[in-house]
């Protein structure tokens, strides 16, 4: 065996052998410390993550920087392959376990950051609320309580009534009358109207009625009862013309014939202009 080969084997064994248990121990510690990290502050968890992330790249660089032997026997090659396969299996297992721990730490850190932001944002809001609660305190006390069921006009009237104030109290005079008693000697008698009955008619008036002197009686009902036709004639009499002459009298039949002739002539005259227009268009 060459001295170079013997030196290379222990170096690889030293890197593969002692470092692997350290990784396992590190895994166990990470699993055990998960509940402890939740109870601790977020600062410690962030520092621990940074240290673990810084340690990983160093291990990978050391494994890559190791010199591989040029001439190895078949048994040594098989041993190296087994060691490499073990290290490759352990690396993804570490990667799979680490992301589980990171989100919890990030959630805890994020929760505290959100709580801190809420606490900082809550401070100015509290101040504003205190200012608002102090400012409307004075006018609320001065305003009277308004009933919710009333409209705007009723509420305005109530406000005006409140400004007027209550009614003034008038002191009642309890003085008693000490003078002489008042007596009313007057009496009332019912007298019937004169002429309401024959008994109450005065005697002189009866004599005048018997003589019928100086008394104008109602006119006699000589006129006939008036019907609707008579009323129409009486109303239309104001609009009639004077009586025509005897020579110019015409019968009703002649007047009706003249009216028909006038209507026919009017229709002919109105029909003539459209014919003239048609002739002009034809030309």
From Swiss-Prot:
Keywords: Acetylation, Isopeptide bond, Phosphoprotein, Protease inhibitor, Repeat, Thiol protease inhibitor, Ubl conjugation
Biased segments, Low complexity type: 107-122
Superkingdom in the source lineage: Eukaryota
Residues with PTM Phosphothreonine: 135
Record region (Disordered): 1-186, 212-283
Composition bias type Basic and acidic residues, residue spans: 46-65, 249-258
InterPro entries to which the protein is assigned, alphabetical: Calpastatin, Prot_inh_calpain
Modified residues (N6-acetyllysine): 50
Biased segments, Polar residues type: 1-15
Residues modified as Phosphoserine: 87, 133, 222, 243
Pfam families: Calpain_inhib (PF00748)
GO cellular component: cytoplasm
Cross-linked residues, Glycyl lysine isopeptide (Lys-Gly) (interchain with G-Cter in SUMO2): 32
Positions annotated as Inhibitory domain repeat: 170-222
S-S bridge residues: none
GO molecular function, one term: calcium-dependent cysteine-type endopeptidase inhibitor activity
Compositionally biased tracts (Basic residues): 21-30
UniProt note: domains: Each of the four flexible inhibitory domains can inhibit one calcium-bound calpain molecule by occupying both sides of the active site.
Function according to Swiss-Prot or TrEMBL: Specific inhibition of calpain (calcium-dependent cysteine protease). Plays a key role in postmortem tenderization of meat and have been proposed to be involved in muscle protein degradation in living tissue.
Family in the record: Belongs to the protease inhibitor I27 (calpastatin) family.
This protein's name: Calpastatin
Organism: Chlorocebus aethiops
